[in-house]
């Protein structure tokens, strides 16, 4: 039913059905309205497991060795409905794991293997993911057997790792702990294109102009087009795409070559047929197809006749074993462009020895030409990549080690710090990309530290702003950032414009001294100072409260910090502190919404935090926009009271600023930004603002503010879970 009137024998029998399609949704009627849906994802209404289910505890009960044994057996248990190439599913499973993890992009931390999102649209139906639905169906008996003790997210990531082990690679390790989502993600921007393989994401001729935060060159691809830029072979141009996209997945040149080569050491591409015979993707398939897509109902369409990418062939002589054959073929042969049976561009070797050809996937008496994609040829022809490839070719052990580490990074990049890894195969080594933080001291006199903070000459605004700036970098997407580690005192964070370096230096000097005197970490004292400021402000508003505090944060060092990797965490805007670094094409309220989602806040938590921070005097550079109170420093609900007061009128001024005037006299009372006024203009946010403006909700406002504040301060305290 889609809500349409049904008055014929073939129409919907319900006169006013529920709206089950998007044709007449609110966003269709009002496409420019602020869409708060990204803040209301993945709650108990979509999760069938119930609010008391804790996957991170459940997975600890898993028989890890039995699971791995079953996965090893799966690799060579070929099923007639989807036969394994050469009797081994390793290549398919690796592609599935790679394409789950490879959707990660460092700019906003979204994508990646951490949620099992490959089960849902749009990823389950991307052109680059053709036939990965078959890989997940092959895993279903194992998922069914181990049930709640293994998430789809963990199983999808683990399958590729076990596949490599089964083909002879010594892997670096594996950490469990990825929790499944149960609904397509609404917050991830995959691009603006309205058609598959669209490439309207460049604002210039340079391949570096790829739109942020995207890390793929076309809609529906994981990284680059394997045939070449926009489907036109040109290895040196493709090398530019490879460098940009892998860089945006947090990989350097050596890791890029290792991952490309290691991913193509095993398995094959599939294009031995006509793609026009493929049925619709899983989301568009008929109900009888039961969630499977790209079904060929015209020709055989399986085994040697499978069509996926359209390119046809294996990269190496022995596609079911880990070896150095990729570099042997790539570097020792000349290659020429040809078309696959499906019509895709691919590179094939000139005058190849018969014994260097891989055998047919079904008949070992037949040998086939190996192939290379344009991305593979980029490794050969780009001088930087070529040098790395030659080193790997000469030193297979080094290649295997670099690849194993890069594969581990790829499949764990969005899991956050090592403390979140579960299981017997977690590597002991701390890796700098994990943003390590040492354990902090829990056994110090918290009351004494609070007393010293309260006795300092720091203002409420200084204390609260510093704590907020330290914690606001947290991203729930890849679990990076946050207050733990106190990296706000290190490069690059101490110099970020959004952190007001001059003010920050003054505050840190005082707080570091208090930390030294009390035995607390600086990270703890920064958060504690924010709490002290809030307690003071609440008291000024007539409420005695204690802001919850959990000691034990550690202090990271420069040696533990890859400064360059933190550049992507720099706030370029902060609606909570009413600040924009510069004017952007995106509306300020939308930027705030994106930051809110990354921090893991709900719409009403966002509302109460903005209203509270305004009256505490925390605006960047002490601007007065949105400070709708004459009691700055008191935790009152004045922001909401005055925002909703019809004695006021709101008049545009300049540069997205507004004047709030007395409706009778016309006198200017306050100034505001779009971020301030959206809490009165958006119908949903206004409903929250009205709750907090009520005369009987002054205490509720304070309690809700403290709860939301504490949530942010502890967002990265995975040790408390």
Swiss-Prot record:
A biological-process GO annotation: hydrogen peroxide catabolic process
Location of the active site: 99 (proton acceptor)
MF (Gene Ontology): catalase activity; heme binding; metal ion binding
EC number(s) recorded for this UniProt protein: 1.11.1.21
Residues that, per the record, bind heme b: 264
Modification after translation (UniProt): Formation of the three residue Trp-Tyr-Met cross-link is important for the catalase, but not the peroxidase activity of the enzyme.
Cofactor: heme b
Single GO cellular component term: cytosol
Site label Transition state stabilizer, positions: 95
Cross-link (Tryptophyl-tyrosyl-methioninium (Tyr-Met) (with W-98)): 223-249
Covalent crosslink: Tryptophyl-tyrosyl-methioninium (Trp-Tyr) (with M-249): 98-223
Keywords: Heme, Hydrogen peroxide, Iron, Metal-binding, Oxidoreductase, Peroxidase
Cofactor binding summary note: Binds 1 heme b (iron(II)-protoporphyrin IX) group per dimer.
Keyword Aminoacyl-tRNA synthetase in record: no
InterPro entries noted in UniProt: Catalase_peroxidase (IPR000763), Haem_peroxidase (IPR002016), Haem_peroxidase_sf (IPR010255), Peroxidases_AS (IPR019794)
Function summary: Bifunctional enzyme with both catalase and broad-spectrum peroxidase activity.
Family, as annotated: Belongs to the peroxidase family. Peroxidase/catalase subfamily.
Quaternary data: Homodimer or homotetramer.
Protein name (database record): Catalase-peroxidase 1
UniProt lineage: Bacteria, Pseudomonadati, Pseudomonadota, Gammaproteobacteria, Legionellales
Gene giving rise to this polypeptide: katG1
